[in-house]
Swiss-Prot record:
GO CC aspect terms: cytoplasm
Keyword Transferase: yes
Protein keywords: Cytoplasm, Methyltransferase, rRNA processing, S-adenosyl-L-methionine, Transferase
Main location: cytoplasm
Function of the protein: Specifically methylates the pseudouridine at position 1915 (m3Psi1915) in 23S rRNA.
Family according to the record: Belongs to the RNA methyltransferase RlmH family.
Annotated protein name in UniProt: Ribosomal RNA large subunit methyltransferase H
GO terms assigned for molecular function: rRNA (pseudouridine-N3-)-methyltransferase activity
Catalytic reactions of this protein: pseudouridine(1915) in 23S rRNA + S-adenosyl-L-methionine = N(3)-methylpseudouridine(1915) in 23S rRNA + S-adenosyl-L-homocysteine + H(+)
Organism of derivation: Rhodospirillum rubrum (strain ATCC 11170 / ATH 1.1.1 / DSM 467 / LMG 4362 / NCIMB 8255 / S1)
Gene: rlmH
InterPro entries to which the protein is assigned, alphabetical: Alpha/beta_knot_MTases, RlmH-like, tRNA_m1G_MTases_N
Subunit structure as annotated in this protein's UniProt entry: Homodimer.
């Protein structure tokens, strides 16, 4: 199963990128990034709807979509590993972790999401979230493979 991050916004250099690259280098099968961007100055609701439209257009058919959302569930690493293992058993072609823009996801993306995941109650910079997701995907892979990286 292919792993993807679909994100609003473009990469900049810096330590966030280094963190992401570090864990992607450890992941078997890698982690692809799809970036979309709406540059026109639009009202918040219109921008969120447009960003959702752009993200949805990039999703592989049949993908398991996890929207990173402040109102989502908080999972432990073991839950993430179980969710991904289950999607592999279902022969899903991809698992996509969608990161919205500064104002969050549009309704269309949230409606399409199979799960909504919160990374706790704190607000995180969007570029740092990419690194956090990469680390958690590596950790989930280790849990599923019985590797000692993760300690319960």
């Amino acid at each position: 199963m292919k792993l993807l991050v679909a994100a609003v916004g473009r990469w900049r250099g810096g330590p966030e990128r280094a963190l992401f690259d570090h864990y992607v280098g450890r992941l078997k099968g890698g982690l692809a990034v799809i970036e979309v961007e709406e540059r026109r100055p639009l009202p918040v609701a219109e921008r969120k709807a447009r960003e959702a439209e752009l993200l949805l257009a990039q999703l592989p058919p049949g993908a398991f979509v996890v929207a990173l959302d402040e109102h989502g569930e908080a999972w432990g690493s073991e839950r993430l590993a179980r969710e991904l293992d289950q999607r592999r058993l279902e022969a899903r072609p991809a698992a996509v972790f969608a990161i919205g823009g500064a104002d969050g996801h549009g309704e269309a993306l949230l409606a399409r999401a199979d799960r909504k995941l919160a990374l706790g109650v704190m607000t995180w910079p969007h570029m740092l979230v990419r690194g956090l997701i990469a680390e958690q995907l590596y950790r989930a892979q280790c849990i599923s493979g019985g590797h000692p990286y993760h300690r319960s």
